């Protein structure tokens, strides 16, 4: 990277760790970029004249007399309509073989939107996945995590959401992905002909881990451009936030900071909140909605990353494998969208809230019946019907490979009610039963 004549050059490094180097410098600011022996770095700590730089590629081969040049700016992204359909690395450079982007250069990582400029979310975000749209409906401007075990197909779910979501733009931020994952997303988007509305920022396992820290800010800067400048409905998909948190822990550890719970930095809550609070519904019509995958270590929901995430976000979505049908579903018991009441029955059909509640209640009755059966108790006729209902409900609605619009989901649910139960057993208002109960049942 070329340096300018007026840029001050430092050549005395006082301390070097695996990811950081320290020196004395003046007139510099937090998050400012620098080059250390030609390697890109970012300023992460200031204590008087003592500053610490995080070197993205690692400090191997850097001597104590290395040339350090501060660039006078934070990481930036060039924003324009040319972003659509492109794949970028953590620095906003194209990695798809296409031309450089032309546009306005914007610093990433700015503040979240002032609350007085926000509008209460009121628009439905449809994904085609019934476990979301039917039971845990999403609203524009919402922030929600996807909790999943590492062996579950969460990237497939993210790709499906990107292709099905009824939004103007999709921004994908991938952190710690394998090259296979990167190629999977690229091929799926290309084959579906959906590249024109998707922007992707990728960090793979072959890239330095600390580069992951830039991915969310890059993705959200692009999202803000489309939401503010074009008044577009933007959905940001981030995967995997556990990889992001691991990178935070690496930097914190190498800066000799005292770790908090599960070896995470004490700033974890603030670092996560800074990302999730970018979700917003603008009065002008544009919006940023965030769905972020957080993988669980051994299914441990009490780990610092999912634990802090739960306090910040507006609900959570859980993936689990249903052993009865052999498919991955969105778990109706552990999932919750805290804003769904803003759109269910208002932006969707009027029977939506009651159908949703009735289906989950019957599914819970089936879980109780299964427990009775496993403990050797006799099953009633109702128990047997709930078990049969639960299997079809999982297969036809909860499975992540099912793609229906909300009206079709409701019709399927009514069909299952009519197949296995009498109207009085589903506990839905008579006026709705009279209108939607399957005829001839």
Features from the language model and the residues they span:
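A generic structural signal for well-ordered coil/turn residues at beta-strand boundaries
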Residues: 9, 17, 30, 83, ...
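Active-site phosphate-binding and catalytic loops of NTP-dependent enzymes
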Residues: 75-79, 94-99, 116-122, 230, ...
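Generic beta-structure capping elements
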Residues: 46, 56, 90, 111, ...
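Residue-level signal for beta-strand positions within conserved beta-sheet cores that form or flank
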Residues: 9, 39, 64, 83, ...
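P-loop NTPase nucleotide-binding/switch module
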Residues: 66-68, 82, 95-142, 155-160, ...
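Residues that form or immediately flank small-molecule/cofactor binding pockets and catalytic motifs
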Residues: 18, 48, 92, 113, ...
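P-loop NTPase catalytic core
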Residues: 134-137, 141-441
């Amino acid at each position: 990277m070329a340096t300018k004549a007026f840029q001050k050059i430092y050549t005395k490094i006082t301390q070097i760790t695996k990811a950081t180097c320290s020196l004395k410098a003046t007139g510099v600011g937090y998050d400012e970029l620098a080059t250390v022996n030609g390697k890109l770095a970012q300023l992460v700590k200031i204590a008087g004249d003592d500053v610490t730089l995080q070197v993205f590629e690692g400090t191997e081969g850097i001597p104590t007399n290395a040339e350090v040049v501060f660039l006078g700016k934070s990481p930036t992204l060039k924003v324009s309509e040319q972003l659509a359909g492109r794949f970028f690395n953590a620095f906003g450079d194209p990695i798809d073989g296409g031309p450089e982007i032309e546009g306005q250069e914007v610093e990433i990582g700015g503040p979240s939107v002032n609350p007085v400029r926000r509008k209460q979310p009121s628009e439905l975000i449809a994904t085609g996945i019934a476990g979301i749209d039917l039971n845990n409906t999403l609203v524009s401007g919402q922030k929600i995590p996807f909790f999943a075990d590492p062996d579950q197909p969460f990237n497939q779910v993210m790709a499906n959401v990107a292709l099905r979501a009824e939004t103007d733009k999709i921004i994908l931020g991938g952190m710690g992905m394998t090259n296979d994952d990167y190629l999977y997303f690229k091929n799926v988007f290309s084959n579906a002909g959906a590249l024109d509305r998707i922007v992707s920022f990728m960090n793979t396992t072959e890239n330095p881990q600390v580069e992951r820290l830039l991915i969310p800010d890059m993705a959200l800067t692009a999202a803000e451009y489309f939401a503010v400048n074009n008044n577009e409905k933007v959905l940001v998909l981030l995967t995997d936030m556990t990889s992001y948190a691991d990178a935070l822990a690496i930097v914190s550890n190498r800066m000799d900071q005292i770790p908090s719970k599960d070896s995470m930095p004490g700033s974890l809550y603030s670092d996560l909140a800074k990302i999730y609070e970018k979700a917003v519904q603008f009065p002008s019509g544009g919006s940023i909605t965030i769905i972020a995958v957080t993988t669980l270590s051994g299914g441990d929901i009490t780990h610092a990353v999912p634990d802090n995430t739960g306090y910040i976000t507006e609900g959570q979505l859980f993936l689990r494998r249903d052993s009865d049908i052999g498919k991955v579903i969105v778990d109706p018991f552990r999932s919750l969208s805290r804003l769904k009441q803003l759109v269910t029955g208002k932006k969707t059909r009027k029977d939506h809230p009651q159908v949703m509640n009735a289906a989950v209640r019957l599914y819970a009755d089936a879980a109780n019946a299964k427990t009775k059966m496993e403990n050797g108790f006799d099953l009633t006729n109702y128990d047997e019907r709930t078990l049969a209902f639960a299997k079809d409900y999982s297969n036809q609605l909860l499975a992540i490979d099912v793609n229906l619009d909300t009206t079709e989901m409701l019709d399927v649910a009514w069909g299952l009610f009519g197949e296995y139960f009498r109207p009085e057993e589903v506990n839905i208002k008579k006026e709705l039963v009279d209108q939607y109960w399957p005829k001839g049942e």
